[in-house]
């Protein structure tokens, strides 16, 4: 039986203590709903004095596509103006935006990874709240891919951008509320932060082991297994010549290209004996994104054991094999493509998008293979695991 869980938005008694009688601004998006499937925005507008909305990326109801310019618009249902806080000249609200606000509420579904934009957004929001002396209330949600497994590379302290920041691993194993506590405590942000915790969730639980229905945190993350794969397979977004399955019904589960020898790839992957996952060679034709309307030869990744599967090591192993098989066909995506947000200065300066995703160029330049890279970052992951413990809210 699914475990009964209450998200932060369901903890009305706790919200009343920090929101009643105050002018409230709301940061939210599609997929953020309460136990009765009512949008967070509508719950808050009905109960509190909501005066303003902040649009993160996809609109306050998930009604925009990624990259659409939405500096300001009116939400039809509430009549409230939504201001973009994720745009070219700033990330986070400006002083002008918060001058008539007493408290900001944040409730957005995230993906449990460093490179999912909402992680960077909540950190930037905390900085802005600290600078403008506006309290922030985070309505916590389940960590969708559990809170026990940490994976991947760890950002260097000098790196600051929307896909890598705060010495985080690729798979962070924190809820959004725990992450906010971690950043505030470890990096001295100074945000007046309140986290309304989840009730009933434990760290080893995946999202679909609870009674909370899965609503898309972004258009491509359509189920828990896709989200698990994304924690490593996001690396494929950094290779322009390989489709990661966008434009199909199985994003990240499918990887391929018109030139790929999929049968040989599957044979080589079987030799690697990667845990918790199996592969089938398949044909697919994306309707959009890379190789749109072209027949692709590829693989389908099928998770057989979530607790054993390590998508980060798996994804980079797949890339290793493809580079050996088709070195002339690997084309890395330029670092500037797809970015609509001005970023803080980032050191080291990368020219390939995959390097920003991985927080290093050691893999794309061939200095390290998948296993070497994974092993190299093991000590940094262990340090992170120890650091984050004091900010965890759940056992």
Regions found by a protein language model. Name each.
Residues 256-376:
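Conserved functional hotspot residues or short segments at active or partner-binding sites
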Residues 201-291:
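Glycine-rich, aromatic-lined ligand/substrate-binding cores of catalytic
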Residues 110-122:
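Glycine/threonine-rich flexible loop motifs
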Residues 3-49:
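N-terminal phosphate-binding or glycine-rich loops at protein starts, especially the Walker A/P-loop
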Residues 51-57, 139:
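Short internal beta-strands
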Residues 63-66, 137-159:
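Glycine-rich, charge-decorated loop segments at or immediately adjacent to ligand/cofactor-binding or catalytic sites
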Residues 69-101, 113:
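Glycine-rich oxoanion-binding loops at beta->alpha junctions
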Residues 159-232:
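Conserved anion/nucleotide-ligand pocket segment
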